[in-house]
Amino acid sequence: MSLQRRVAVGTVALACLAALRPPSLSAQAAVLLAGVTLVGMPHGAFDHLVAARVLRPWLGTGWWAPFLAGYVALAGLVWIGWILVPALTLMGFLTLSVLHFGLGDADGDRVGIAGVIARGAMPILLSVALHPAAVAPVFAALASSHVAVVLPMLIGARWLILPWGLLIVVWTGAATAWERAEAAVTCAAFALLPPLLAFALYFCVCHSLRHLLRLGAMLDPYDARAAWFGVLRTAGPATLLCAVCATGLAVQGVETAIVPVFRVLAALTLPHMAVTLWLEDRAEPVPKGRPQLRTAPSRLA
């Protein structure tokens, strides 16, 4: 069992106690903003390192120019979508999120498409199906629509729980015990907690932390301590930049930061997913899960 899964299972299970006294929307937004700042956004700070490992042998020292241009172009395309076709952009964002979460969290190379969709749809579908009234205002704001239009659509999407449940059954047959435990506490969190808080927990503790540790192993697969230092050093500038932006949003009110945060995440999801799908597949393979020593037991175990 990896350290990351132990942390995820314990943290999310403990957080479910918040259901005894549900936090206010402001408190949920503060957790989301803090989590995205400290873990969520920084986990994409490694994209240029992954790109360098693949593109430098082809393009030499000038590899960064086409990478940066492509990254900004993809992010800009999504941002333009929020302006011109917000409803279509929201649907695209949700679809990409399912694929990205599923591929990153379900070890899709081992369990196949059922595992990818089962795990990837979990945070999206459970939010919509179990808490449509709470999700509708956020989706309406993102899509530049009205709650009265969005809410019936979300309620009508509840039927998707049935095919998703069948995929979960298929996936659990190939999953490890701790993968099933993580999925169970994640489902419990989305059932018991407000959807914004449940998503913040999933995105930061499950998805982003797993990605950070995997890329830490890419930096130094032989020395766990050096890998941790590399993670902090690489993610530090992005974390500071996010902290400045988060402070600016918080000054205006943490509740007003919810929609901008999701729009920025959507804009960065497309280029980040391109890196994780295309470039990581061509980079030197690294151990999944956490930094570890190849010649001795991991100090993170």
Residue ranges: model-predicted function:
Residues 53-56, 60-62, 72-129, 136-137, ...:
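Membrane-interface helix-loop-helix junctions at boundaries between adjacent transmembrane segments
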Residues 1-11, 63:
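N-terminal membrane topogenic signal
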Residues 44-54, 98-110, 166-176, 211-220, ...:
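C-terminal ends of transmembrane helices
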Residues 11-18, 69-79, 98-101, 164-168, ...:
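Hydrophobic, membrane-inserted alpha-helices
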Residues 30-40, 86-99, 183-187, 198-210, ...:
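Hydrophobic core segments of alpha-helical transmembrane domains in multi-pass membrane proteins
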Residues 16-30, 250-253:
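Short, hydrophobic transmembrane alpha-helix segments
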Residues 113-173:
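Long hydrophobic alpha-helical segments that form multi-pass transmembrane helix bundles
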Residues 193, 202-219, 227-232:
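Predominantly late transmembrane helices and immediately cytosolic-facing juxtamembrane segments
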